[in-house]
Amino acid sequence: MKPLSQVIFERRATSHFKPDPVPQEYLEAILQLAGQAPSGYNLQPWRFIVVREKENRLRLQKAAYNQEKIAEAPVIVIAFAIQDDWKNYIDATFQEAVRRGVGKPEMVPQIKEQAAHFLEKGIPQPLWLNRHTMIAVTTMMLAAEAYGFDTAPMEGFDPQAVKKEFGLPENAEVIALLAIGFAKEPDKPYGGRFALGEFVYNEQFGKPWDGNGAAKGPPGKDMAEKIKRRASEKLQPA
């Protein structure tokens, strides 16, 4: 499996896919890793519909402005979340955390109250659901790249049409589509990214980043070894 820095730098959005299937064991591994994404209060609001049957991909294609890659890719994941769904499992989630040694039972009511107040009054739920679900989608995309598959994230679709075609409730938020498979063509050339000084500020907005912003690829071998050494030292018992 590729190192993470290589996965990030080599990932590209694929325009056209081969019809070759994604083996079940790899698909499940990718989905499992996506489910390990972090989320506020560990509420994991993301939900995924895995679409593989040709007729269902064609239905989805119609709801996504007839993008060719939806009909071509062997797997399309519909990423969505449901408003207020967290109320159905917040107790079980916190109880499981306590069972695993995360926190004390007597703290659960207070944490639950904090979470409920935040989700009901502190932030618009669609915004919160989008934030967390996209973390999981990004994790899924990088996991697929690490296993040697190609992906294409998509935001071009009609949410209402997707909900209607795939039986989602009205209070669902359809957040993204992700195609997974094998690219039919070589990756496009690297389109480049902003230098650090163009998107990173030092301590406050408007204060330039004080690095040279020259990094153009994954950390070199020396840097990778240094990071591994630091991680190893950190894990040593005191």
Could you say what each language-model-derived stretch is?
Residues V22, E55, F157-D158:
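Short beta->alpha linker loops
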Residues I30-Q36, V77, R99-R100, P109-E165, ...:
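Small-aliphatic-rich amphipathic alpha-helix that forms the alpha element of a beta-alpha
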Residues K69-Q83, L168-P189:
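A glycine-rich helix N-cap at a beta->alpha junction
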Residues Q6-V7, A13-T14, A176-A238:
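C-terminal helix-cap and adjacent tail motif
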Residues L4-D20, Y89-I90:
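Generic N-terminal amphipathic, Lys/Arg-enriched alpha-helix
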Residues P38-Y41:
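Glycine-rich phosphate/pyrophosphate-binding beta-alpha loops
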Residues R47-T133:
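Glycine/small-residue-rich phosphate/adenosyl-binding loop
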Residues K2-Q6, Q24-Q32, L58:
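Short amphipathic alpha-helical segments
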